[in-house]
Swiss-Prot record:
Name the UniProt record assigns to this protein: Glucokinase
Any one GO MF annotation of this record: ATP binding
Alphabetized Pfam families for the sequence: Glucokinase
Organism taxonomic ancestry: Bacteria, Pseudomonadati, Pseudomonadota, Gammaproteobacteria, Enterobacterales
Binding residue positions for ATP: 8-13
């Protein structure tokens, strides 16, 4: 008889829940709930389990916020809870709450070739560190290493490192944004809101007044080639994504590959392919050759957060991935 665990991927807007086959890691019965419709994460979980008429004893939920102890307070939502209390209330034997990019990193060993699109570099080196990052509402970052037959995710808040300009134009953008918001992190330019910041700074640098555009508007106008400023913003976004990925590669020697997740890049895949992304990734001066062969992959799996939550839980329960 198949034994299932509950897995989840929870963001500021939606909570996506599914079942994970503990033996194989296969994800099934995924369903998305609006976080605004429920008073707590526990309430959503109860609804899901009732709807699917299933009993589970183990669970792993990935959440888009730092996880530093028993008390979890979501960054972009009002939900807050004690992990131990929720585990007790649900009657679970085991409940893991992990960072969303910890989950994405743990999905990488489970991905198949059809889930990946490669952007330059050679083959990944087995056993070497891996980096994963992705732009969405924010900028998530994690690393993954293989130690004693176990995958170990190294979570952090790498999206909040300083934005480091490397051209005159990027320097001007930094100054404009710094005057507006103070500290300018990488997330302030590599995210949905970050794309808007780039567009606004490009227009303001030319002493013009920017329109009140959303990320979707900027992307659509850039792809339609109907707005020079939007196209420049999207081009610069791709270049800065490359610089940032190259920095991750240098920091931990990620010869196991650099992986891009998040919902933004797949929306303009052909544009991204033709952009200055890879050139910027390798633009490391004296260390250009060091990063030259490091492969970059775009993750195109539908639910890497769910897949990785399942992988994390299965490994915790003693399975070898």
């Amino acid at each position: 008889m198949t034994k299932y665990a509950l897995v989840g991927d929870v963001g500021g807007t939606n909570a996506r829940l599914a079942l994970c086959d503990i033996a194989s890691g296969e994800i099934s019965q995924a369903k998305t709930y609006s976080g605004l419709d429920y008073p707590s994460l526990e309430a959503v979980i109860r609804v899901y389990l009732e709807e699917h008429n299933v009993e589970v004893q183990d669970g792993c939920i990935a959440i888009a916020c730092p996880i530093t102890g028993d008390w979890v307070a979501m960054t972009n939502h009002t939900w807050a809870f004690s992990i131990a209390e929720m585990k007790k209330n649900l009657g679970f034997s085991h409940l893991e709450i992990i960072n969303d990019f910890t989950a994405v990193s743990m999905a990488i060993p489970m991905l198949k070739k059809e889930h990946l699109i490669q952007f330059g570099g050679a083959e990944p080196v087995e056993g070497k560190p891996i980096a994963v990052y992705g732009a969405g509402t924010g900028l998530g970052v994690a690393h993954l290493v293989h130690v004693d037959k176990r995958w170990v995710s190294l979570p952090g808040e790498g999206g909040h490192v300083d934005f480091a300009p490397n051209s005159e134009e990027e320097g001007i953008i930094l100054e404009i944004l710094r005057a507006e918001i103070g500290h300018v992190s990488a997330e302030r330019v590599l995210s949905g809101p970050g794309l808007v910041n780039l567009y606004r700074a490009i227009v303001k640098a030319d002493n013009r007044l920017p329109e009140n555009l959303k990320p979707k508007d900027i992307t659509e106008r850039a792809l339609a080639d109907s707005c020079t400023d939007c196209r420049r913003a999207l081009s610069l976004f791709c270049v800065i994504m490359g610089r940032f990925g190259g920095n991750l590669a240098l920091t931990l020697g990620t010869f196991g590959g650099v992986y891009i997740a998040g919902g933004i890049v797949p929306r303009f895949l052909e544009f991204f392919k033709a952009s200055g992304f890879r050139a910027a990734f390798e633009d490391k001066g004296r260390f250009k050759e060091y990063v030259h062969d490091i492969p970059v992959y775009l993750i195109v799996h539908d639910n890497p957060g769910l897949l990785g939550s399942g992988a994390h839980l299965r490994q915790t329960l003693g399975h070898i991935l």
